[in-house]
Amino acid sequence: MLHTQVPEEEGVELRRTADGKGDGVLATRSFAAGETVLVGFLVGPLTGNDSHATQMGPGRWARHGGLGPKVNHSCDPNCGVRLNDGQAFDIVARQPIGAGQELTFDYAMRNFTIDHFPAVCLCGAARCRGSVTGWKDLPATRKANYGELVAPYLRTMDDEIRRALTEGGR
C-alpha cells in the first residue's frame, strides 16, 4: 500500500483509494467548510499544457509541488481552489470533510479547457458530467455553485467573453 505523509501537509495523506481507481489524497482528520486543506506551492513554469499542469491564466501553465497534484477530480467535489500569495492554488474544503474521506476538486475550477484526459470521467458522482471538461464547458449554475473557490482568471475570461458577445451583437 502506497502511504506518504509530507510534514507540511498535516491532516492528509496519499493512499490507494477505496474504490480501486488508484492513488488519492485522503483526510486524516476533519476539516471545516472554508478551511485550507493543502497549501499550494509551485515548482516551476511550463511551456504548455499536460495532464499535471495547472493553468495559471490564458496561455500560462505551471507545475504544483507536494500532494496538490495528486488530488483527484470529481464532478461534485468536496474541495475548491483559492489563489494564494505565492501565486499557487490552495485546496480549500467546500463542505465539512471527515477523516478518511478522499479530497476531490473539479479540474474545471482551474482550467479553462481540458484536452488531456480520457473521454470518460470515472469520478462516480451522482452529478457526474460524463467527461472531465474545462471551465468553458460548465453550465452557469455549476459555475455559480462553485462561488469564489475557482481560479480568478476563469471569471475574468467569462466576463471578457460576455463583453465581446455583447459588443459583437450591437
Residue locations for each model-derived region?
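Conserved catalytic SET/PR domain of SAM-dependent protein methyltransferases, capturing the structural core
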Residues: 1-170
